Amino acid sequence: MVFGFTKRDRRVPDLSRYDYYYQNHEDYNKSPQLSAAAASAASAASPDRTNYSRSHSLVSHAPSIPRQRSSVKSPGRRLSTSSAAPPTSRAAAKQYSQKTYSLRSQRSGEYHLHPPGYTTNGSRMNSMTSGANVRRNYGKNKSTAGNNNDSRANSITVKTTQVTDPSGRTQSITKKTIRKINGYEYVETTTTTKNLVPLGDSQRHFDEFSENYMLQDDDILEEQASDNIHDIIEENETDNEKPYSPVSESHLQDDSELNVEKPDFPLGSYFHHKYSTDVMPLEEESSLSNFSDALDYIPPTHQTSSKYIHNKRKQASTTRRKKRPPAVKNAEAEAKKPLTEAEMYLKALEVAKRNVYHTDAASDNASAPLGSNKSRKSRMGQKMTLRSSSDSPTATANLVKSNVEVQPKRFTSSFFSRNTKSAPHEVHNHSVSTHFKSNKAVDPVPEPKSANTGLTDKEMYDQALKIAQARYYNSHGIQPEAVDNSTTAAKPRQVGVSHLGSTGSIPPNEQHYLGDSEIPVQSEVHEYEPIPLQKTKTTGSSKNKFKTMFDKVLQFSQENYGYQHKKEQGEQTPVTRNAEESFPAASISEGVTTAKPSSNEGVMTNPVVTDSPSPLQQQIDSTTASSNGQSQGNVPTSAVASTTRTRSPELQDNLKSSSSLLQDQTPQRQEDATDPTTSSTNELSAAEPTMVTSTHATKTIQAQTQDPPTKHKKSSFFTKLFKKKSSR
């Protein structure tokens, strides 16, 4: 029970339905004593009526007080008045804080329980209460008031009232603090008014857009107006043509005083409307015209330069000017008349052509009448079309004459130089927008619209290609003849590989080379260095590709381990068998002896000795020792001989083609390399001899077959054992 009572005493009652705005303020005292005092203050007390006291504050017990108005502005102890009605005026636009102090007895609430006319002997009351609270508290029990006197002692009550305007902004905050000490109430009222904007500001800002600001713009123009009437006319031609409507008679008088010299214009002209004073004001025309110039309004600034007026005049409309052409008959005004858009375009085109072609000849387009129905093309259309509008005979002749002086400075196109056979005196034009036909070079006739139908697709393509080349050469300043010579010199020479022997007779057992003759060869270290070869492009089926891949795997395993030569002997093709049968016969008849392999700096070389070696063979033998990776000195001679005879047809074709390329001594740079591991020094390439026999000569080349670089594995016990067995 004790635990429950203590918990109930510390519990704060929920007063959010009465004072929900207290929760958002930090200075609100949320102690349980305050809530208990507020609950006890809600119940009225009725002590003995004979005792009375004076109250120096007028308190209203009506519902929430939206606004408070003070009758005395000076701070200190004063009579504070609370009212439920809204004020008729607002305070000045500044923040101020007022505090009022009042002393009131706790028994002052007894007067709220009776009608306003009920009084006792000798009782005085200096406070007035509203009738709403009196009617509400009139029928309450009197005996329940005296029991709560002790609970109301020594308590503090804070009440805060916040007043907002319809737009949601805070206007004033009133904080009322009531301290009850020893039966007395100390009332402290603090009012903070936040009126940042006066009353009429919003309405004044809204009314600014309903006025006419035509006179303000005209004043800016009139300050810089000169005495010459023609300058005024020139300014008014490009001015924004807004309806002129005065606001008041004072502005009309100022306007008439500034414009002393007013020209006499016709009644229907534009300038008569500009300077006339009998125009209906803008506000009187319609209700919608009040905001017609809201977008055109420019706030007046202190900058009155001509640049400001020029930027404002860019908004002038051209349609109004066409409807009301100026009726000025003065010669100077006609001389200063602004150009139309078409005339400006023609002048700009003439200047551009003069800058491009470096000539002073005027363009024919400028002299053309404006009313001509000749359709103009845009610059993008002229660039994208092959046949430009300057193909007419007059334009072509003028452009040819204009380029006579500039001709030595430019390069001559090979396409246009072909026409010199028929007309040697004619000077050809190198401009981008003109071209000539190759079949008619004397007098070009303007083509009809259906001229494209007479050409075939191939002819049109050829002409377009020539025109594009000529334009490219002219734009980059390249001489086409030099380009043709450089392209012919840069083309790779076609190497004709001869597959015949020295006498031209081929034995029936020799293989013919049918692959591509242009094999990319890489020689970066020396001219006669052994060159790594790439696999030729096989045009066979996927089965052949799989075969070559399988041969590569066998070759790699054979070169690295050296004990798989027996497996490869059973996979020989019939073509290689025929070639193998010819190898012993040729070697026996010509006395070819195979020397034992000797390792030189870790590189195995297998030279083939012949009776009369050729000079090319001596050069090849002198360059066979290269810095390649792995030594194969432990492979026996019989294994080398067997591996030499077990070459696939693709590899033999590669070796034959490489020998023919070395004969011609025309090494080319490798461009279409497919293996990314190709470099000038291959780490794991093995040098093996291959004998290609013919009727009278035996040529030997030491080819390097490319293998992908692999990491060297440590030789295990089994690999050493297999190597020992193979060496035995």
Swiss-Prot record:
Q: Biased-composition ranges for Polar residues?
A: 48-58, 95-106, 118-132, 140-171, 363-373, 385-403, 590-634, 654-668, 675-684, 691-708
- Where is the segment annotated Disordered? 33-171, 236-261, 300-335, 363-403, 422-454, 495-514, 561-728
Q: Which residues carry this modification: Phosphoserine?
A: S57, S64, S127, S151, S155, S363, S660
Top-rank taxon, per record: Eukaryota
* Biological process according to GO: reciprocal meiotic recombination
Q: Any idea which residues bear Phosphothreonine here?
A: T646
Q: What is its main location?
A: membrane
Q: Which ranges are annotated Basic residues under compositional bias?
A: 309-326, 711-728
Q: What membrane topology term does the record carry?
A: Peripheral membrane protein
Which residue windows does the record flag with biased composition (Basic and acidic residues)? 251-261
> Which ranges are annotated Low complexity under compositional bias?
35-46, 80-93, 635-646
> Which cellular components does GO assign to this protein?
plasma membrane
The places in or outside the cell where this protein is found are: Cell membrane
Q: Which UniProt keywords apply?
A: Cell membrane, DNA recombination, Meiosis, Membrane, Phosphoprotein
Give the note. Answer: Present with 131 molecules/cell in log phase SD medium.
* Main function: May be involved in the control of meiotic sister-chromatid recombination.
Q: What is this protein called?
A: Meiotic sister-chromatid recombination protein 3
Organism annotation: Saccharomyces cerevisiae (strain ATCC 204508 / S288c)
